[in-house]
């Protein structure tokens, strides 16, 4: 992909809605070949840059509550996992494809944005430019 030519190293992991205890590298194998999120946190050093890409649109319970996940029972709230990522890595960004003018219509977007403390940008040329500046701070 074009992204692989722009980054020295690029590892891609998937999750559904909110980050929980497992991620996967291929969506078709999401139930059979999962990677513990703790392993990802231990594998990559704090100097790595982390970019989330997603609409952040979900039930607020998925972020705030244990057991709020829609596909499995999560023992810890998604916010706990987001906090772990934000504490481990200094340079974290969330790129959101939902037009920024619509973010206020979805409470979960606001919750994720609060966790990311201003490090959520829209998937626009201007947003990507701002996101890259944020990652380099």
Predicted ranges, named:
Residues 1-137:
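Acidic, low-complexity intrinsically disordered regions
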């Amino acid at each position: 992909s074009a992204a692989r030519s722009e980054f020295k190293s690029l590892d891609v992991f998937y999750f559904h809605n909110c980050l929980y205890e497992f991620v996967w590298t291929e969506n078709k194998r999401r139930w059979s070949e999962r990677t513990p999120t703790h392993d990802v946190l231990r594998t990559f050093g704090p100097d790595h840059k982390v970019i989330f890409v997603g609409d952040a649109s979900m039930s607020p319970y998925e972020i705030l509550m244990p057991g709020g996940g829609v596909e499995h029972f999560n023992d810890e709230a998604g916010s706990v996992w987001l906090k772990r990522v934000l504490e481990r890595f200094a340079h974290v960004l969330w790129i959101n494809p939902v037009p920024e003018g619509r973010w206020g219509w979805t409470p979960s977007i606001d919750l994720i944005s609060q966790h990311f403390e201003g490090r959520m940008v829209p998937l626009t040329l201007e947003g990507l430019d701002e996101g890259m500046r944020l990652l380099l701070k």
